[in-house]
């Protein structure tokens, strides 16, 4: 395919137009008075959301250079969402401000590499300042406040805090759709481990990139599964039972994997293959934990069991299994409660008798997985559109609360970034690096200014007032008052704020140092078929 090439200022401005198109759509959602964005779907009802990454993913631009610019800033939102679970809109606003200021300096003749180095040093300093000023999350109320800000709903924040209180900070919290109105919290036996599906073809929900199995059988194998003849007798029995199958093995490869994938694509049989977590003896122990939790047995030659002679009675069961690309959650395994309690007691004894800190840590992880359970938040709403939007908000808020527990919290509302600006004076940079640091200085005000603008206030006036206020004091955009934001319960996890800034700076550096852009040449649309005599094509007279 033919390519089109743009150089120098033309290339950078093309990328910036794409970035601005995406950022302008995303930034209207920032803050408590931010608006929603409606996303058209090819099938089904439209989605209404105020989540930055969901909006960013939907934007496809026609101009090839603008398209690349939008894709680059999409990456900022995606990366921030992956790392911290929130802050995608803040990251987009920061990226736009950094690129706008940076390109102005490049156009005036500044060296892009010097600017990039200055930006990197300034971001490192601000990150260090944010981490130093972070307050540890100690109370249930602090968790509730942080989650409530992310979800824009205090009742959601309270429920998430209660869920974390029940299952612990490392516990698993899942969100499900409910047929009733309102929110409910249920505690179930369950486990989550850090291994996802082996092949993307197993996905059942393309939008969320998840494989969801309801009431599945669970096959646990301690070795590799590669030949289909070993698996076939058992597969036939499972198909007859009419249930999906989750396979957890050392690995699933070759014809065994292709058989499962082909049957899934054809709709003949729903299954998911996942690698077992851990290595060596720890893998065996974790497989045994899963067997006890699900009421199954591990198929292993060590205990005289082989895959080709395995019966359906050796399979475990669960109410539901959710598999993403990175992790697997088993909800409500069908294991005997006495057997689970016995296994928990055994692991506790091993922890007491262990001399190694590493072994003790890994045993604690196993104990948390087995004993912690899974908190299920069931969300209901009047319409399907509202339900999807609400479910998404709750999932974001759960990740936000976990990030807060992990690294602590700072004042929200863009105030922590603005109050970190004086730390840049300590850098003592010169020349273009100092200009790079000044670009960051200007950009750090952007989130607060956007929150003020969305709240119908004058951004410059608000920024000036907050700049001259004591640390942690800022605008509560919901009420229009200036107050101590942490006391008012307006806090952001420092992990979210830090990730947003680091990812925005990373992309801004790439924008500034770009000197040429190579893109696919847009194809001209073919003329519609017509009658060579001049009549209308496709008509019978």
Curated annotation (Swiss-Prot):
Its EC number is 5.6.1.7. Signal peptide: none annotated. GO terms for biological process: protein refolding. Changing residue 525 to T: In strain: Linda. It catalyses: ATP + H2O + a folded polypeptide = ADP + phosphate + an unfolded polypeptide. Disulfide bonds: none annotated. Keywords: ATP-binding, Cell wall, Chaperone, Isomerase, Nucleotide-binding, Secreted. Changing residue 508 to S: In strain: Linda. One of its GO terms (cellular component) is extracellular region. Changing residue 45 to S: In strain: Linda. It is found in: Secreted, Capsule; Cell surface; Secreted, Cell wall. InterPro entries: Chaperonin_Cpn60_CS (IPR018370), Cpn60/GroEL (IPR001844), Cpn60/GroEL/TCP-1 (IPR002423), GroEL-like_apical_dom_sf (IPR027409), GROEL-like_equatorial_sf (IPR027413), TCP-1-like_intermed_sf (IPR027410). One of its GO terms (molecular function) is ATP binding. It holds the Pfam family Cpn60_TCP1. ATP binds at residues 29-32, 86-90, 413, 476-478, 492. It comes from the Bacteria. HAMAP family: CH60. Forms a cylinder of 14 subunits composed of two heptameric rings stacked back-to-back. Interacts with the co-chaperonin GroES. Belongs to the chaperonin (HSP60) family. Together with its co-chaperonin GroES, plays an essential role in assisting protein folding. The GroEL-GroES system forms a nano-cage that allows encapsulation of the non-native substrate proteins and provides a physical environment optimized to promote and accelerate protein folding. This is Chaperonin GroEL 2. It comes from Mycolicibacterium paratuberculosis (strain ATCC BAA-968 / K-10).
């Amino acid at each position: 395919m033919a390519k089109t090439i743009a150089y120098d200022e033309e290339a950078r401005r093309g990328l910036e137009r794409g970035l601005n198109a995406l950022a302008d759509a995303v930034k209207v959602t920032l803050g408590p008075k931010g608006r929603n964005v409606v996303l058209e779907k090819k099938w089904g009802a439209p989605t209404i959301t105020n989540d930055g990454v969901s909006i960013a993913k939907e934007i496809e631009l026609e101009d090839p250079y603008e398209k690349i610019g939008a894709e680059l800033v999409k990456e900022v939102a995606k990366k921030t969402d992956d790392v911290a679970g929130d802050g995608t809109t803040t990251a987009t606003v920061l990226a736009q401000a950094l690129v706008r200021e940076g390109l102005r300096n490049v156009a005036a003749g500044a060296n892009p590499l010097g600017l990039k180095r200055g930006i990197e040093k300034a971001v490192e300093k601000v990150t260090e300042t944010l981490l130093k000023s972070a307050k540890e999350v100690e109370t249930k109320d602090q968790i509730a406040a942080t989650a409530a800000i992310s979800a824009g709903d205090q009742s959601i924040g309270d429920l998430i805090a209660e869920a974390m209180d029940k299952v612990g900070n490392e516990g698993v919290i899942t969100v499900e759709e409910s047929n009733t109105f309102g929110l409910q919290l249920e505690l179930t036996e369950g486990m989550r481990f850090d291994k996802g599906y082996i092949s993307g073809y197993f996905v059942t929900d393309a939008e969320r990139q998840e494989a969801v199995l309801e009431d599945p059988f669970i096959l646990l194998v301690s070795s590799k599964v590669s030949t289909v003849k070993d698996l076939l007798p058992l597969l036939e029995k499972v198909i007859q039972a009419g249930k999906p199958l989750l396979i957890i093995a050392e690995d699933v490869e070759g014809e065994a994997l292709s058989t499962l994938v082909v049957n899934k694509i054809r709709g003949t049989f729903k299954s998911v293959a996942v690698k077992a977590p851990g290595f060596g003896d720890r893998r065996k122990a974790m497989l045994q934990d899963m067997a006890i939790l699900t009421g199954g047995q591990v198929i292993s030659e060590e205990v005289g069991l082989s895959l080709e002679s395995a019966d359906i009675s050796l399979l475990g069961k669960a109410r539901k299994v959710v598999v993403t690309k990175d992790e697997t959650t088993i909800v409500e395994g069908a294991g005997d409660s006495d057997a689970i309690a016995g296994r928990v007691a055994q692991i506790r004894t091993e922890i007491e008798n262990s001399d190694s800190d590493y072994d003790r840590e890994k045993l604690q992880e196993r104990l948390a997985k087995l004993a912690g359970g899974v908190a299920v938040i069931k969300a209901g709403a009047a319409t399907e559109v509202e339900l999807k939007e609400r479910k998404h908000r709750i999932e974001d808020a759960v990740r936000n609360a976990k990030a807060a527990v992990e690294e602590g919290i700072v004042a929200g509302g863009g105030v922590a970034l603005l109050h970190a600006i004086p730390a840049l004076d300590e850098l003592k940079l010169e020349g273009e690096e100092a200009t790079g640091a000044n670009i960051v200085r200007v950009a750090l005000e952007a989130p607060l200014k956007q929150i003020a603008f969305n709240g119908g206030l004058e951004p410059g006036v608000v920024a000036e007032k907050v700049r001259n206020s004591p640390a942690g004091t800022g605008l509560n955009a919901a009420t229009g008052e200036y107050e101590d934001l942490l006391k008012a319960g307006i806090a952001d996890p420092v992990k979210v704020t830090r990730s947003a800034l680091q990812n925005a700076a990373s992309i801004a550096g790439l924008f500034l140092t770009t000197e040429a852009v190579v893109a696919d040449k847009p194809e001209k649309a073919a003329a519609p078929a017509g009658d060579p005599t001049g009549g209308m094509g496709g008509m019978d007279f």
